[in-house]
Amino acid sequence: MSVTPVILEAYCAVSDEVAKQVKKYLLGDFAEESKFERKNSESSDGSETQFCRATEKKENVEVWDDWGDKEEGAAENSLESDESIRNWLFRCDLKTYSDAEYLLVTWESRFVVLRKPPDEPVYKIVCKQYIEGDPISNEITASSIFGLSNVRHIELLDSIIIALGTLDGHVYFFTEQGTMLYFDRFSIFEPVNSLQFEVVKTGQTFIVVFTKGFFMINPISLKSVLYQAKVLIAKCEKTVKQISESIELQSELLAPDIKGNIIHVIFTGLHKPSTLEQYISASYDSFYAKVEKPSLPLYSTFMVTTEKEFAVFVWHDREEQDKLIDDVIKYGKSLVPSFGIRKFFGISTEPARIASHMRSAVHAPTRSIIMETRVAQNVSRSPDCQYVAVTDRMARVLVIDIASRQVVLIFKGYRDASISWVSVTEDDRVAQFLTIFAPRRSLLEVWTVLGNVRVCAQHVPSSECNVVTGGENKMLCGRCHVHTDSNSFFIDEKGEFHRIALPFHLALTSRSRQDQHDHLLLKQLENTKTGGEDWFQTFSDLKMATSRKTTFQNALHNLSTAEEAHQFIARIRSIPTSASLGDLPNSAEKSIGFYARTVAETKPPVGEYDDKDTSNYKLDSIVERILECHMQKFGERTDMLNDSEVMKVGEWLKYVDLSQEDIDVFSEHWSEKQRHCLANLIFGPLFGSFEIDEYYDTVLEKIPVKRKNIVKLFYMRFEKTTTHIDWRIFNRIVEMFLNLEKSETGILEQVDQMAMDSKDVPLGMILLSICWCARIQIRILKGNDEDEVENDHDLEEEDEKNKTIDEWDAISPEAEHLDCIIMCLHCVSLAQSLLKDDSNILRISDVVPRIDSYIRENVAKWIVSTPIDTDTIEKLFPRDPSENLAEKGNEEDRRKQMIIDFPDDKEVVIQRMYQIIPRVFEHDLVVADVCWEMMSQWFREKDDNFSYIKDCTTLLPQSIVDPRLRHGIARLIWDKFIFMVFQSIVNMVEKTGRRPKDKETRKEIGFGEVKLEEFLMECEKFLEVLMDSVRDMPPPIDFKQDLLVEMASSSFAAHLHQSKTAYRQDQFAILASRQPLVNFHLVLHHQHLALALRLQLTTGLRFHPLRNLFCVTGNRAFFASLDSHPLIPLDRVDDATMEKRHAFLVKVAEQGSMEERRLARHLEMEWKLTVNEISFMQALSSFRLGNDHQGSLELASCVRDDRSAVALARVLAARLIQLANEANKRYSTAHSQYLCALAGEEAARVELYENSPDDPLVDSNPKTWKDAVTSLGRAGNSVPQSAQAAIPFVRMNDIAKLYFGAQWVNN
């Protein structure tokens, strides 16, 4: 098996021009020398531990068998490249920073800084600089590049610092622009071996390494010194030499207890040793000395490699360093005022500077010496500071665990190797990889540390390559705990930099973590197009068989067509790892073949199949006509789902498994759309060209769905289909149900039940007809089988009387009276077409018990909503339908004359139903439903539909002929709709005792107060209808049921599995006729209350009618059932109640209009009272309007008294004032004051009688004011009963005679 090649992303390159400039500046006269030859080290065959990998011999990458899938093709063996123009790069010292954004190249005493611009793929020269002085003593032996954090923001970069160590022990600090900031000498006798700026999670430090020891420079002190130097140089206050001689760099020289010379030093962070409690107080000074510490001390740990010890760990106590930091901080504070106040007053003092090379060494103990016989070449610390990778001269690469200080991995066969680390982050997880470049083998490898697995490997074209770390972008005194990804870069023979890109999932390649590896790849597959090259490549990288199976199945679910699925499976089989899929591809191809054939047979027939005019079964002609009409309407539906939308092959494979015994398609896991698509797929061939027997054997028998669920799916498909249904499809459906019934008994009963439960009447009619045809066919087949059995046996003929019950032919009720059922359901469908609202559409099983009532209800709703006037109702539903009902003749001829269609005109729809079931539409029955529908609409929205109650009280007494039906309808309306509202109005007016609150009563009433009077008037009309209906005690009515409906009801009982005598819901008319007769006197008692309430509300009186107008016994009778018989003293009440009634009528007469006084007179007659004020107020109102004729008649029936005389005198005075205005005369002052004072407000009320010329009262009334004065004087002259009351008439007679010559009494 092959290993995944290393992904090398092109990052940056050194252009030819830049390379020539750098080469010429650094190398000078040595620029044309031969390329740098790598030193060879001798190999040894030392014994290794059992976990070493034997990779010493040169092997090809393509034959490795670490992990992964086998791929074809092999990489060509790399050869040594020729001389390159950039091989000088490997002769120089190369350092990187911030993912190779900055490069530091040093040679002898010169250095060059290169930088990669963000938008360019090549390096640019930032500076070219050298160290002044003796070129031999200033030869650069060590270098380092790091960032300097900003003073105020530790996350911001201030500048790049270049640190250079020389042969004479100096360390110089430059900026990236080549400006020297500071230098210090750390040794006089030794060169600087290395400079390292180390950053770990627990801290950071700057290390200067020599042969026997190393300096640990405090980072705070280094930052302070560099910033002071930048400020002083920028202000030109001091030179670099003056700064370096005046400012001291705080450092500490550590002398570890080692044997050989130091090669490498790695800072491994701060640690607490796992020592016993008794050793906490031990001191290095002497055996008896004791150190008191509150807790375990912190130690700075270093890993050191020497010439005699492969790896040794150095421990340094942090206590002294902490004291050092305090001194640095104090020193920094003392320096700040020295630039200002101290210097201003001339009292500043320069601190005593201690040279770094003069510092005394501090002893540092060592622990855990590892492999003394080896000599290290290269070292590299992991990004998380847990591991250190070391190469030795024995061609080994060792990985050391810092925490346990042990070797955890050893790799063989990597002589002169370069090592580096790469870290990759995903969410909160970090993966680390070790990159190894073996130049002798031209091999680049990537290993995981945790699993010890080679995840990537690749041959490179030339050995003149290298791997370098990208350089951390950590800054001096910046944040240490923030993790960032670490990158490594591969430098090829052309000097181009390539970033080694490693996906995170490669870290999960251990055999115990293959499921996690596959999980990451599955995430990639979700975003990859199924069937593409990338998808197949990722699929081949999966490790576990379960992952392959899951991925294969999920990929199948995303496919659309069968051809695409076949191609996909063929491609999968070409992959070597497809054998782990087992039998999945075979079963999938089998299922896809079934799907493809089913889809192919779904196409409609062409040419050879002709539409048939009739069915293959003996259906009645009227049934065929009705079914043709509804089948045509069935295909005209546009609001249903698309029949062509079938399951895609992916969905088919996801939800349907042909190997299963049963699939519950009606479980919660299936959505409604998925069921519909499955139904379209299964029953598509039924509407296509597939032979029905072959269709049943190859589709319905093979699909793992129960027969009952198949029927449900067919119902879903048939219910929402838009396909045109013809007799061919009808016959095929019958044959399908025949086969289903043969295989499992009870299918037709299930279809029957579905038809009865359907709200779609055309669908139910077609299904019932299909079941009828299937049952007839089953009966015929059963009879043929019995005839064959009788022919096989010679049976003797017997007399019919001797036959047993089993020998008689059984009659199936379900197969009888299909014509009656279809005709009634056709009328139901016509009735539903009258309404646009579908809220009243019920199931057929709910309509069956009351077909006639349901049809009339729909007709009533149409009449109310249209609306239809009374004349149209009389025309559509005549009161005497004897001509239609008396028609005699052949029933078949009458059915042929019936028109079967769905007309647009609603009145024509009524006529179509009337010709089929005329008795359903008797006049009184229809009007009764109309009245009930009006009141129902009023009760739902009382305020908006208030006019319906008036229409009902108008239609009810005029149109319903039968008094018993009229009485029942009025009684039901009163009890259901009127009674509670009427009672609430009475309670609201009373407002006494523990009555309901005003808010509750208004809510019960449901309309505004302005409509209360009109409602009470309609209540009076309803009560009047009840009284008129019971005067003659009408007998119960007997409505005959339509024969067609009766036969259909008996057949429906069989379909509903009920007996023929099952309870049938009462019609509304029958329910109304059964209402008990009301008590005439109790109804009259309520009418008196309604009239009294209306008078009170119209006149605005503050009165309590129940407490004042009726006695206690009468109050108890209110709101009782109208058919009860309580004691009601209508006219025999106590005197107190009579007086209150009298006072009430007097107030109405005084404050009401003529209409209210007319109603008050009606109450007066009912209560047998004599109220003079009513007649007199009527007369007075007539005189005010100039109707003297009517006023005289009313005055004649009044009791004459002085009070009436005064009222008439005021009207007479008002007429005299109007007469003066008409004659343009002026009264004397005394007369004028007298008449005005006497007339008062009546002067503005009086007027002459005005009406049309056809009015007979025009000639009987005065036409001028003079005639009016004379007429009223004569009529009122006899009213006064005393001399005092007659004085105004005598005086006004003199005034009329004096001024106008008119008089009515001779003085």
UniProtKB/Swiss-Prot annotation:
GO terms for biological process: establishment of protein localization to endoplasmic reticulum membrane; macroautophagy; regulation of GTPase activity; synaptic signaling. The keyword Cytoplasm applies. Its main location: cytoplasm. It holds the Pfam family RAB3GAP2_C. One of its GO terms (molecular function) is GTPase activator activity. It is found in: Cytoplasm. Keywords: Cytoplasm, GTPase activation. InterPro entries: Rab3GAP2, RAB3GAP2_C, RAB3GAP_N. The keyword Metal-binding does not apply. GO terms for cellular component: autophagosome; plasma membrane; presynaptic membrane. Probable regulatory subunit of a GTPase activating protein that has specificity for Rab3 subfamily. Rab3 proteins are involved in regulated exocytosis of neurotransmitters and hormones. Rab3 GTPase-activating complex specifically converts active Rab3-GTP to the inactive form Rab3-GDP. The Rab3 GTPase-activating complex is a heterodimer composed of rbg-1 and rbg-2. This is Rab3 GTPase-activating protein regulatory subunit. It comes from Caenorhabditis elegans. The gene is rbg-2.
